[in-house]
Amino acid sequence: METQPEVPEVPLRPFKLAHQVVSLTGISFERRSIIGVVELTIVPNSENLRLIRLNAKQLRIYSVVLNDVCQADFTYFDPFQNICYKEHKSRALEVYSKHHLTAAQYTDPDVNNGELLIQVPPEGYSMIQEGQGLRIRIEFSLENPKCGVHFVIPPASTDEETQMNSSHMFTNCYENSSRLWFPCVDSFADPCTWRLEFTVDKNMTAVSCGELLEVIMTPDLRKKTFHYSVSTPVCAPNIALAVGQFEIYVDPHMHEVTHFCLPGLLPLLKNTVRYLHEAFEFYEETLSTRYPFSCYKQVFVDELDTDISAYATMSIASVNLLHSIAIIDQTYISRTFMSRAVAEQFFGCFITSHHWSDTWLAKGIAEYLCGLYSRKCFGNNEYRAWVQSELARVVRYEEQYGGIILDCSQPPAPLPVSGTNQSAASSKQQEIVHYFPIKSLHTVSPKYVEAMRRKAHFVIRMLENRIGQELLIQVFNKQLALASSAATTKIGAGLWSQLLISTNIFIKAIFTVTGKDMSVFMDQWVRTGGHAKFSLTSVFNRKRNTIELEIRQDYVNQRGIRKYNGPLMVQLQELDGTFKHTLQIESTLVKSDITCHSKSRRNKKKKIPLCTGEEVDMDLSAMDDSPVLWIRLDPEMILLRDLIIEQPDFQWQYQLRHERDVTAQFQAIQALQKYPTNATRLALTDTIESERCFYQVRCEAAHSLTKVANQMVASWSGPPAMLNIFRKFFGSFSAPHIIKLNNFSNFQLYFLQKAIPVAMAGLRTSHGICPPEVMRFLFDLFKYNENSRNHYTDAYYRAALVEALGETLTPVVSVAIHGTQITTDSLSTDAKLVLDEVTRLLNMEKHLPSYKYMVSVSCLKVIRKLQKFGHLPSLPHIYRSYAEYGIYLDLRIAAMECLVDFVKVDGRSEDLEHLITLLETDPDPAARHALAQLLIDNPPFTRESRSRLDKPNLVDRLWFSINRLPYDTKLRCDIVDLYYALYGTKRPNCLQAGENQSFYKDLMKDNNSSVGSVTGSFKKTSDSKSHLPTPTNTLDNEPQERQKPAMVTIKRTATEAFEVGDEIIKLERSEEITVLDEPVNVQAYDSETKVNALQADEEARDTHQAAKRLKNEMYAEDDNSSTMLDVGDSTRYESSHEEGKLKSGDGGLKKKKKKEKKKHKHKHKHRHSKDKDKDKDKERKDKDKRDPHISRLQARETATPDTLSSEDSSNSNSLPPMNLN
């Protein structure tokens, strides 16, 4: 293994960036190329500047000129071209991560590094003077970019006019990756002013950052040049460009805002952006600050790898965000994304971060502001439900991959040592080690970046709770005021650093505004990863009228969980009102006695005051002696935590019925799934029917009621759950079983109408199948669905109905006749009806497509379920066709999801290779990233599993990709995540197993050649045994888990092939069998060398015939006589030749034959002649007497196929070596 290279110590950048000009004069869609020139104006810090480091990747540099007169030499070096591909032996992520971080640090602009090194020539020394500008002019070109710039060109099959109208290009830089399309200082910490010039065809529009100054036609009148100016200093990563034949729409409410879209999409654009001006007004009013730039542009493009990306004065958004006025569901999503992009104009584009470790601040503040706008726009319930779901996603990520450290630039301060608290002094925070380096943006997982943004938002919310929202907004306002003042100055004033924000600067700003020192808070939640996890139990003490609480932190040693010290809010709802108590958590076990303010008066008082101030009537008959109705922990979600609360079912029911906070209602619904009683059933039913409940709570209650009903199936009485509720809300007055015309004007009922059928489809009878009443109900919904008078589309509703059909499916229980194919005749009645409906809808979608092909997406997933449950042949062809480039993105992702699941369950190596090819070569970056996430979340195999897909060539391919993807950082880190999901951080097991097997084969070859030269035949004697290596010794180095037998299910289909050694055996039938996956005991034999026990031609011919019969028997059509063993590349061979077994007497042989005969007779139920069997036994006995050392393969050559099969099935471990040539 190569030693890890050391990054040389480099001082801070010896110059300041003052201004930059970017001029792209040749943008060719035909060649997918760019020709341009940049001019950087720098201000040296001293006269000793001799080496200038800049960032540039995948560019061809033609010349570098200083001050237009002096040619300078330059060198280019990109360590990402080959990170550590030479590490053939290790192939371990723990080795790769070190080299990965080193490569990133070699080109990190924050520490004055870069790919392009410009050497100042001696004649240029006089130009370098401290405080005076130096212009660096670089001519470059870019051809067929792999990343950074994306050209969208329709296929040549379309007509020329459509191709020209739809062709466009845009920059899609992942974080700081502007170096991929022009030379620059690619750092968030180096803002400067800009002049941007783009020459394009006369019928195209170039949209870029800053204010459009003028558009000038070229002398030949074939092209025009767009001139933009950015007078406010911004950094290179926040510069973007989009070129195409865009339709332009000026916002009627704010003329400074302009929107651009592709031809034909203007009506959708107008509807989508009609409320965007409200976001600007909200942020300006909340922050008491004007929008920091003079204009804002929003461009909608195709094949963008994210939903939206914010840059200085502009955003590039996906065309998939556009929707008409008839769409309900997409409105929430699009409005949230666009409002977040506007918030990032304040923090992220105007105010940027000092370093990668400070990025959490800009991301967190922008997300926090977006949340405030969403609360105003969609309501408090929607906001709190969103916060709860985001918290759950952060907790889930940290517990799966490890704690998220927001600021990794410096470790937290050590804990204070006190004589009274030695445990706190001795306790040491667990070191968080990820499989990727977190010190560089170009090495971290995209999943980590997304989870970091969510966690950063929660940290800002925690700050809001500690200092108050008003003071927190003042801190934001102070930073914006300083930055606005600095942006109007020249670089000589030295104030541009106020455009940057860091953790330490933020701490000082909070102290300046509030007088509170937040250093301890930052150490606890920003510089330390992980979250808290609490378990709460309570007991009521009747004598003392106290509630005895016990709060435990039992999971502090698990991944992603840390011990919490500090205040914790406990809220008790008592008979006399809501009471909050703050407990101080100082250890992993805290016990506290809280005196109750109420006494048990359940028969005297029914009006209960709630925390909202209202009083409600409660039925207290279910209560015990405790006056506490329910208990909540950290109700305002001011901690990063996970909760386990234990309380009786009636308390959860009270909480669900009467608590007004939606987060508490979600908790109660989740907890009530463990209490399948009539009271729980009634509480969930009342919640679904209550119009006062938030619509998401009602939908969640419907899904929870399904699980409760399935546990109560034996005692359930009446119609299926929720059937009467649905008919009550949506059935006709005269005939409730006939659904009314669709009317989605009430959004709460709309979401409920989508959720209830899916929930009902999960109901099961005592036999584990969907009730017939539910099946009829669902098909009636399709039959009577009528949307002609509805103002809104029913695409999402129909997609939900198709999903409900899929939920009704259960695995096949009938046994088909062996060898027969699955046809429509063999389908059950319900499965056939489902298949017919899905096929009809899928075909209809090709002529009348729904919005985003939502119905087709659901149909593909149902077809995959039909395959998994055995109703359809498991074939991937339909998914491959829908996953091809050119299909709508959402439909492609759905097909890829089905393909990933198919590969995991039924796939072969070529199916997995097809997915890897898509991952590496698909033209759409959004599809590549989505496929990577699907493979990571549902990997084809894991390190612990023993899969036939786990092969060395797959390791080689993935290892090559993560080492040879220098430009696409996002895809490279995605494949690193996939590599970890498959193999972990250590060396892949298949490489070790392959080496062990090769080593064993070499030993066997050497031994066979040596034995053959001395004896001329294979005779097992005491002398020869000492010379033969024992295979078990070669397995000592195998991982322990590979030696544990496990039950493995093997599926064989008519078109499937198994690899046995170097042979590919194609099966002629289809079946699933389960075998014991353990080492196969075979003869001392090399799989590539023939057994040289028989020398005569006649004996060799007989051996070949016996092996042929063995092969035929292994794959015979009779299902009762076949036993299949999966023998792959990593199969281990153990010798079954023991001297005592081969020299056993006739009595042992007779006893064994009787046993095998008995098994044979029982298994095949055939009638055989006893005399014939005796003759065969006698003949076999005579042969054994003639040569007791003969190989077992020859001893069985005269056996009939039936007898041979019975022996094989009765003793699979004694199989002879199979000659399948």
Swiss-Prot record:
<dbReference type="InterPro" id="IPR014782">
    <property type="entry name" value="Peptidase_M1_dom"/>
</dbReference>
<comment type="function">
    <text>TFIID is a multimeric protein complex that plays a central role in mediating promoter responses to various activators and repressors. An essential subunit binds to core promoter DNA.</text>
</comment>
<protein>
    <recommendedName>
        <fullName>Transcription initiation factor TFIID subunit 2</fullName>
    </recommendedName>
</protein>
<dbReference type="GO" id="GO:0006352">
    <property type="term" value="P:DNA-templated transcription initiation"/>
</dbReference>
<dbReference type="GO" id="GO:0017025">
    <property type="term" value="F:TBP-class protein binding"/>
</dbReference>
<feature type="region of interest" description="Binds to Tbp and Taf1">
    <location>
        <begin position="845"/>
        <end position="1213"/>
    </location>
</feature>
<dbReference type="GO" id="GO:0005669">
    <property type="term" value="C:transcription factor TFIID complex"/>
</dbReference>
<dbReference type="GO" id="GO:0003682">
    <property type="term" value="F:chromatin binding"/>
</dbReference>
<dbReference type="GO" id="GO:0051123">
    <property type="term" value="P:RNA polymerase II preinitiation complex assembly"/>
</dbReference>
<feature type="compositionally biased region" description="Low complexity">
    <location>
        <begin position="1206"/>
        <end position="1221"/>
    </location>
</feature>
<dbReference type="GO" id="GO:0000976">
    <property type="term" value="F:transcription cis-regulatory region binding"/>
</dbReference>
<dbReference type="GO" id="GO:0006367">
    <property type="term" value="P:transcription initiation at RNA polymerase II promoter"/>
</dbReference>
<dbReference type="GO" id="GO:0005634">
    <property type="term" value="C:nucleus"/>
</dbReference>
<dbReference type="GO" id="GO:0000979">
    <property type="term" value="F:RNA polymerase II core promoter sequence-specific DNA binding"/>
</dbReference>
<keyword id="KW-0597">Phosphoprotein</keyword>
<feature type="region of interest" description="Disordered">
    <location>
        <begin position="1111"/>
        <end position="1221"/>
    </location>
</feature>
<dbReference type="InterPro" id="IPR037813">
    <property type="entry name" value="TAF2"/>
</dbReference>
<feature type="compositionally biased region" description="Basic residues">
    <location>
        <begin position="1150"/>
        <end position="1169"/>
    </location>
</feature>
<keyword id="KW-0804">Transcription</keyword>
<feature type="compositionally biased region" description="Basic and acidic residues">
    <location>
        <begin position="1170"/>
        <end position="1190"/>
    </location>
</feature>
<feature type="modified residue" description="Phosphoserine">
    <location>
        <position position="1136"/>
    </location>
</feature>
<dbReference type="GO" id="GO:0140296">
    <property type="term" value="F:general transcription initiation factor binding"/>
</dbReference>
<feature type="region of interest" description="Disordered">
    <location>
        <begin position="1011"/>
        <end position="1044"/>
    </location>
</feature>
<keyword id="KW-0805">Transcription regulation</keyword>
<feature type="modified residue" description="Phosphoserine">
    <location>
        <position position="1135"/>
    </location>
</feature>
<keyword id="KW-0539">Nucleus</keyword>
<comment type="subunit">
    <text>Belongs to the TFIID complex which is composed of TATA binding protein (Tbp) and a number of TBP-associated factors (TAFs). Interacts with Tbp, Taf1, Taf11 and Taf12.</text>
</comment>
<dbReference type="InterPro" id="IPR027268">
    <property type="entry name" value="Peptidase_M4/M1_CTD_sf"/>
</dbReference>
<dbReference type="GO" id="GO:0006366">
    <property type="term" value="P:transcription by RNA polymerase II"/>
</dbReference>
<feature type="region of interest" description="Highly charged">
    <location>
        <begin position="1138"/>
        <end position="1183"/>
    </location>
</feature>
<dbReference type="InterPro" id="IPR016024">
    <property type="entry name" value="ARM-type_fold"/>
</dbReference>
<feature type="compositionally biased region" description="Polar residues">
    <location>
        <begin position="1027"/>
        <end position="1037"/>
    </location>
</feature>
<dbReference type="Pfam" id="PF01433">
    <property type="entry name" value="Peptidase_M1"/>
</dbReference>
<dbReference type="GO" id="GO:0008270">
    <property type="term" value="F:zinc ion binding"/>
</dbReference>
<dbReference type="InterPro" id="IPR042097">
    <property type="entry name" value="Aminopeptidase_N-like_N_sf"/>
</dbReference>
<dbReference type="Pfam" id="PF25316">
    <property type="entry name" value="TAF2_3rd"/>
</dbReference>
<comment type="similarity">
    <text>Belongs to the TAF2 family.</text>
</comment>
<feature type="compositionally biased region" description="Basic and acidic residues">
    <location>
        <begin position="1129"/>
        <end position="1144"/>
    </location>
</feature>
